[in-house]
Amino acid sequence: MAKTIIEKIWESHTVVDESGKPNLLYVDLHMVHEVTSPQAFEGLRLAGRTVRRPDKTFATMDHNVPTVNRYDIRDQIARTQMETLAANCKQFGIEMVDLDHPENGIVHVIGPELGLTQPGHVIVCGDSHTSTHGAFGAIAFGIGTSEVEHVLATQTIWQSKPKTLEVHISGRLNEGISAKDVILAIIAKFGVDIGTGSIIEFTGEAIRGMTMEERMTICNMSIEAGAKAGLISPDQVTFDYLQGRANVPKGEAYDEIVEKWAQLATDPGATYDRSVTIDAAEIEPMVTWGTNPGQGAGISKAVPRLDDAKSEVERRAISQALDYMDIKPGTPLSEIEIQHVFIGSCTNSRLSDLRAAAAVINGRKVAPGVRALIVPGSQRVKKRAEEEGLDQVFKEAGFEWRDSGCSMCLSMNPDVVPEGERCASTSNRNFEGRQGKGARTHLVSPAMAAAAAIAGRFVDVRKMVKAGEC
């Protein structure tokens, strides 16, 4: 019987399967950070339990980390969370990359860098964007703190079996279209609830043509489409990325495991509970205008008018979003001015993202009145970027070059957008207050964010490149 990759991984990890009840799944990798783990470790202590598989548990500090002076942690709660993680990892024998470690960074960036993320795995973390790791052909999803404790104690997790959803991107992408544009276009077209109760498999020629870092961007925002997780069947691109990484088998063992990984791909003729298709050729550089990731459009479009709404519920949603964003209905996206630019986050802070931004920025200057930040996703990315001279490109243009961390993606560290000001951000969420109280967030790709920094407003980066302005 033909099966999807989702079914293959789920079935191979099911420990308990009772009719009408959630399945008990074995967990291959449990990633931990400082924000969602303190109560979980305390629960272990109170119950007199240990961590069942410390060798399959990995920790880092990322959410609260300052990106200017990493050790100047002025918020007492943030400091306590970081100190508590270090103490817990020491007590329970868990590997942790702290602020001094050369591999420190955002958990969803360093996991793949270190080869911890591998095809066929079930991966969990107390963070919603764990779906990033699905790019490798893994079922990866975020969990709550009580579930973190359960996984620490048992290396298993109870989960209801999800439905399967295929999102097929047909044809080839036009030049200048990024993975971020693709996932934003998918969410804008199908809505933020298209994936509810499902795990998405992304398929199609456009997906196969993407690098692993681009695939990570796609899967990262599966959660913004309402899905439990998102993944892509592994192929030679996946295997080439993983070969030689620290935690990946070497020599004959590598050849053997690649043979197993290759068997994970969805079988020809396998069926999904639902399939939807988007034409790659219709996707243009995207900009969100509202307060959820589905409220977005191509740069050539305008913010919707209230009369464009298909229902009274949608009309109210548009009105509320535009009131918060302080944008008039019908405003062309290319007329929206910005005061801040943030290039970073677990969505778009890898080396290829920084290269894309640098290609636009090179030889140009940040517009007057715009504050622009570049925050690498890991210290490894920062080091590589500096070796290539990308940091000089950014600094000469007027960007602030920072250390790694979650930074301005969320207002849990010193990097915030002031109230009432507008940010072009490569992160994944544009909810009210996400980047700071009263902050207004527009989600875009690294290239589009770079172009906005130069122009002081949203522009079609393809036209900027074609005109020789960068």
Curated annotation (Swiss-Prot):
GO MF assignments: 3-isopropylmalate dehydratase activity; 4 iron, 4 sulfur cluster binding; metal ion binding
Binding site for [4Fe-4S] cluster: 346, 406, 409
Catalytic activity reported: (2R,3S)-3-isopropylmalate = (2S)-2-isopropylmalate
EC class of the enzyme, as a word: lyase
Family designation: Belongs to the aconitase/IPM isomerase family. LeuC type 1 subfamily.
Record function comment: Catalyzes the isomerization between 2-isopropylmalate and 3-isopropylmalate, via the formation of 2-isopropylmaleate.
Name of the protein in its database record: 3-isopropylmalate dehydratase large subunit
